[in-house]
A protein has these predicted regions:
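Active-site-proximal alpha-helix that buttresses catalytic centers in soluble enzyme cores
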Residues: 1-254
């Protein structure tokens, strides 16, 4: 039986950020060496930009269509998405449309799919980036209007339980937002902060919304509020601990 591993990411058009996706892909490919490896990106905008550069990456339906045409019978689809949400819902629907085209089509869970994974992520963040007295660790996620946004306040609790007394969870487009995080920093007397993307890659959001020089970036707004800021410009995909968590997700479906 011909088997394939299809790793599905939102994608990025930032060349350096793509390294973080590829690091996760390598771990996943090594975890299923008997399967032919292929990738797909779900963002139409990113796929268009990459195609214009001569670096095409298929969408999920196109990738599954190609696998079916090649006679593949067993496909393990592992997303690199961090949480359940609108993007995962669409991915799931797109995959379900091909269920009858394969003898077996299995879809993996996102990274932060349960409390155990949140605890592991929190422990990793505190261990790697926990700040000395007077400083703060601020994780910045994407955020969503989907109910799955509750992962972020849950992560705040997990950080504290992991020993991150001055570790804070914020989001670009969800809750907690900038105002909530700044209020906590002020209340706890934090004069310095390390901003770390809580995203697979340090792409557009990290470059602009987190660390950009414009007045609306988190870096600029924190500095305007009197908080000294350093930024880490690598995504979660660069961390071996996170790569291992993705590997565990894949083992659930192969």
């Amino acid at each position: 039986m011909k088997q394939a591993l299809l790793v599905v990411s939102f994608g990025t058009s930032v060349p350096r950020a793509r390294q973080d996706i590829e690091a996760v892909e390598r771990v996943l490919a090594a975890g299923a060496p008997e399967r032919a490896f292929c990738r797909a990106y779900t963002s139409p905008t990113i796929r268009r930009i990459l195609a214009e550069r001569g670096e095409p990456v298929p969408g999920l339906p196109e990738a599954l269509e190609a696998l079916a045409a090649a006679g593949v019978e067993d496909v393990a689809v592992q997303p690199t998405h961090l949480l359940y949400g609108f993007e995962y819902d669409k991915l799931k629907a797109d995959a379900a449309a091909f269920a009858g085209r394969f003898a077996r089509l299995a879809l993996g869970r996102p990274l932060a799919a349960d409390s155990e994974s949140l605890r592991a992520l929190a422990a990793c963040m505190v261990r790697r980036f926990g700040q000395p007295e007077g400083g703060a660790l601020v994780l910045l996620g994407h955020g969503t209007e989907h109910f799955a946004n509750m992962v972020y306040p849950a992560m705040q609790t997990a950080l504290r339980l992991a020993g991150g007394r001055r570790a804070y969870m914020g989001t670009v487009e969800g809750w907690p937002g900038f105002d909530e995080v700044l209020a906590q920093l002020k209340e706890d007397g934090c004069g310095q902060a390390l901003l770390v993307p809580f995203m697979l890659v340090a792409g557009d959001h990290a470059l602009n919304d987190m660390a950009g020089d414009g007045p609306k970036s988190w870096k600029s707004r924190l500095e305007a509020a009197g908080v000294g800021v350093r930024c880490r410009m690598r995504g979660l995909g660069a961390l071996p601990e996170v790569q291992a968590l993705y590997g565990a997700r894949l083992r659930e479906i192969v």
